[in-house]
């Protein structure tokens, strides 16, 4: 008897700065999925959050102009209906596994994971709470610190406490060179390296455009940027390590390096580091994955100082899958091919769904429970 193919739904796009990166990742994954094993549907969230159906999403996959397709599709949509944005969800009723390839807002912050949970379907990646915490740099650092995982010192600045953190005070505590980062943005959006009061104030003003929580971090001098990929649910493993080297004229691996002009960026995989340092970074990656309760996959980013001391930077719970993305490349050099990696991620999603199905949510029937007497005092 022939085995039934699994129906995989790729969700991509979204309203983040990585919309086009998401499209490229999803296209690569679609091409790599073994069509003898899987039936594949694709659903694109537009930049305004409207979910296109499979047919129209495939038109964009096949090269039609995205703006033209979206304009044509939404012209007759009644947006007074609060469910209009997700009206095409009816197409997913026979989906076996959701594969979100949405970076940043909506994709990595727990939003779309909540949708999958409501639909009671398996999905690749971390759960609702884990995704939300991992996307918030402030909550991530707090949780890692509680678990003894080394990360850079910082202060949290909000519109309410901004006056309590003038540049002079923060510089005295963390050093004159600082990084100013929105807590809940990806792709280095809104991140600034500052060295004086004027730059600091301008960076805060810009950062508040993207979030009301701003991290002001100490700057590690001339760090090496090292990456580690993690795979698994509870039984997890770390990949070999990779490194990013940017042009000497640039301050850090910023949005421009990532998406505008990456011609001067060098990716080294695997990177040759002292064995002790390599093992420490791999162990910190596994410890962080567990502390954040991640599932399926994550890429861990580190800064290594001149004394070979690694500092945890951040976690990416839905890393890119483009031709130059580090997550799949690190597994490639670790012995797992691109297509095999995708097969494993799909199985991990099914395993996690089945494990969660064993959890009981039984409640006493309302009206049958025994209650105490209510005493009204004077």
Curated annotation (Swiss-Prot):
Residues 141-347 form the ATP-grasp domain. Mg(2+) 2 binds at residues 314, 316. Belongs to the D-alanine--D-alanine ligase family. Keywords: ATP-binding, Cell shape, Cell wall biogenesis/degradation, Cytoplasm, Ligase, Magnesium, Manganese, Metal-binding, Nucleotide-binding, Peptidoglycan synthesis. The gene is ddl. PANTHER family: D-ALANINE--D-ALANINE LIGASE, D-ALANINE--D-ALANINE LIGASE A. Pathway: Cell wall biogenesis; peptidoglycan biosynthesis. ATP binds at residues 171-226. Binds 2 magnesium or manganese ions per subunit. One of its GO terms (cellular component) is cytosol. Mg(2+) 1 binds at residues 301, 314. Cell wall formation. It is found in: Cytoplasm. Signal peptide: none annotated. Its main location: cytoplasm. This is D-alanine--D-alanine ligase. GO terms for molecular function: ATP binding; D-alanine-D-alanine ligase activity; metal ion binding. Pfam families: Dala_Dala_lig_C, Dala_Dala_lig_N. It comes from the Bacteria. Disulfide bonds: none annotated. Its EC number is 6.3.2.4. It comes from Ligilactobacillus salivarius (strain UCC118). One of its GO terms (biological process) is peptidoglycan biosynthetic process. Its cofactor is Mg(2+); Mn(2+). It catalyses: 2 D-alanine + ATP = D-alanyl-D-alanine + ADP + phosphate + H(+). The keyword Protease does not apply.
């Amino acid at each position: 008897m022939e085995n039934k193919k699994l129906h995989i739904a790729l969700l991509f796009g979204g309203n983040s700065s990585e919309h086009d990166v998401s499209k490229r990742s999803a296209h690569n994954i679609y091409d790599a999925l073994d069509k003898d094993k899987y039936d594949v549907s694709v659903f694109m969230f537009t930049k305004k959050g409207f979910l296109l159906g499979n047919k129209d999403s495939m038109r964009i996959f096949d090269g039609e102009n995205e703006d033209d397709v979206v304009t044509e599709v939404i012209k007759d949509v009644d947006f007074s209906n609060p469910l209009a944005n997700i009206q095409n969800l009816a197409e997913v009723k026979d989906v076996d596994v959701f594969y979100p390839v949405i970076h940043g807002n909506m994709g990595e912050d727990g939003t779309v994971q909540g949708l999958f949970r409501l639909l009671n379907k398996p999905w690749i990646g971390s759960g609702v709470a884990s995704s939300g915490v991992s996307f918030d740099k402030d909550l991530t650092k707090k949780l890692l610190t509680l678990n003894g995982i080394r990360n850079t010192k910082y202060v949290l600045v909000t519109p309410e406490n901004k006056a309590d953190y003038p540049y002079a005070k923060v510089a005295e505590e963390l050093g004159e060179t600082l990084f100013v980062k929105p807590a809940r943005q990806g792709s280095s959006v809104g991140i600034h390296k500052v060295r004086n009061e004027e730059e600091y104030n301008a960076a805060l003003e810009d950062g508040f455009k993207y979030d009301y929580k701003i991290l002001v971090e100490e700057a590690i001098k001339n760090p090496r940027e090292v990456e580690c990929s993690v795979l698994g649910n509870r039984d997890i493993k770390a990949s070999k390590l990779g490194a990013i080297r940017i042009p000497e004229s640039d301050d850090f691996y910023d949005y421009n390096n990532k998406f505008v002009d990456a011609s001067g960026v060098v990716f080294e995989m695997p990177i040759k580091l002292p064995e002790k340092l390599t093992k420490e970074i791999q162990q910190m990656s596994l410890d962080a994955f567990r502390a954040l309760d991640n599932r399926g996959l994550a890429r861990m980013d580190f800064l290594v100082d001149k004394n070979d001391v690694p500092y945890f930077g951040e976690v990416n719970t839905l890393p890119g899958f483009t031709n130059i993305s580090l997550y799949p490349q690190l597994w490639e050099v670790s012995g797992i091919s691109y297509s095999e990696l995708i097969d494993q991620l799909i199985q991990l999603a099914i395993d996690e769904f089945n494990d969660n199905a064993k959890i009981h949510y039984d409640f006493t029937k309302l009206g049958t429970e025994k209650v105490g007497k209510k005493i009204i005092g004077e």
